[in-house]
A protein has these predicted regions:
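His/Asp/Glu-rich mid-to-C-terminal helical/loop segments that flank catalytic regions of hydrolases
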Residues: 191, 306-352
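Acidic/His- and Gly-rich active-site-bordering loop/insert found
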Residues: 61, 87, 123-161
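Second-shell loop/turn segments in exported
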Residues: 40-48, 64-74, 119-124, 163-175, ...
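Alpha-helical metal-binding/catalytic segments enriched in His/Glu/Asp
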Residues: 133-135, 149-210, 330
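A non-catalytic alpha/beta surface segment that caps or lines the substrate-entry region
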Residues: 69-137
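N-terminal hydrophobic or amphipathic helices/low-complexity stretches enriched
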Residues: 29-94, 137-138, 143, 347
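Bacterial N-terminal signal peptides
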Residues: 11-25
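Metal-dependent peptidase/peptidase-like ectodomains
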Residues: 142, 194, 204-298, 302-307, ...
Length: 352
């Protein structure tokens, strides 16, 4: 009988085959039938369906066949295509270039010295462009108000071997878990009654080497930046943090705004970041948005585990009950926000 590893590998290869024709022509990925007023056709996932989708998406994104989704590599592009295909299947509207779900981003040439230094010991491949995958669920009563849900697609790719000889930095927790969360939330909201506000789902490329995807989103956003009511970035939620209750998540910059406390009032299991000395608020894609004045925070449960940025950040280390519960716990609070008239605000001296 085939091994579980072989079955996972086969599923990835089949998925790559299924989207290979789309990779040749990104326009064919999204077609021209979707519009900003597209009507999602899916139903919201049950708990069993959510668990199944979370397992499937994580297995794809963190598989060795994606070689760690290195920033600005073919494998990151495959991850972006995978997300774009999911968005299209859900009946969401495209938020990328020219009516597609992909935003193509040219990297500077030559790359800045800090980036060259960061990738010096990783796979030697041309890194000239990255990709964002973006989808839109248009609101009803106040479509001009936007809730932005984000994560990053990439990890480190192929690099120095660890003690076991593993050279693939799979990035299961960082940040396949966050990408999976955004895809699951997209499915949940696409299958529910349309919210009052618009929801934008954005998966950024090349966060690990300097936030190039995020910067391109800010430079050419699918909606006016001033229309964004709030941003939640999902980063490393695949394992529980012993510093907080097992069913909880933490929010970076919790005291900077009234956003976290209000989400908690509406059912989110959110606490203040228990690792303030790590400056996580400034270390994720939310920070660039916050510097534009957007209320933007990162949701996480990163425990400072030793697998961070190592080949050992593998699918086998993921706490799936925690991950699925974490995603499910955010559905109602985000749905409340998407249907509310309330707007979060910075606390005194909270805006960076």
């Amino acid at each position: 009988m085939p091994t579980a590893s072989l079955l996972r590998r086969s599923s990835v290869l089949l998925a790559l085959f299924a989207i290979s024709s789309l990779a040749v022509n990104p326009v064919s990925l999204v077609g021209q039938s979707s519009s900003f007023d597209a009507h999602p056709s899916q139903t919201a996932p049950t708990s069993v369906a959510l668990d199944r989708e979370v397992h499937a998406d994580m297995a794809f994104l963190a598989d060795d066949d994606l070689h760690g989704r290195g920033s600005a590599t073919r494998d990151e592009h495959i991850a972006a295509l995978f997300a774009a295909a999911r968005f299209q299947t859900l009946g969401l509207a495209p938020g990328g270039d020219k009516g597609t779900f992909l935003q193509k981003v040219a990297l500077p040439s030559p790359l800045p010295p800090r980036v060259q230094q960061r990738i010096a010991h990783f796979e030697d491949t041309p890194r000239t462009q990255t990709w964002n995958a973006i989808a839109i669920l248009r609101g009803t009563a106040s479509p001009e108000e936007v809730v932005l849900l984000t994560a990053h697609l990439d990890h480190l790719g192929v690099g120095p071997a660890n003690a076991t000889g593993d050279t693939i930095y799979n990035g299961a927790d960082d940040d396949a878990s966050g990408t999976t969360a955004v895809l699951a939330l997209a499915q949940a909201f696409a299958g529910s009654p349309r919210p009052r506000r618009t929801i934008v789902f954005a998966l950024f490329g090349s966060e690990e080497i300097g936030g190039f995807g995020n910067a391109a989103f800010l430079a050419s956003p699918p909606v006016p930046l001033a229309s964004i009511v709030a941003n939640l970035e999902f980063e490393m939620i695949g394992r529980a943090d012993p510093a907080i209750p097992a069913d909880a998540l933490w929010l970076t910059g919790f005291d900077r705004s009234n956003f976290g406390p209000e989400l908690a009032k509406h059912g989110a299991h959110l606490l203040a970041d228990p690792h303030p000395s790590e400056n996580f608020f400034q270390r994720s894609d939310n920070y660039a948005l916050a510097r534009q004045g957007i209320i933007a925070h990162t949701v996480s449960s990163f425990s400072l585990h030793k697998d961070y940025h190592q080949p050992s950040d593998e699918l086998s280390r993921i706490d799936f009950p925690h991950l699925t519960s974490a995603i499910a716990s955010m559905i109602d609070p985000i749905q409340w926000l998407a249907n509310a008239t309330w707007r979060p605000a910075w606390n005194p001296n909270g805006r960076p």
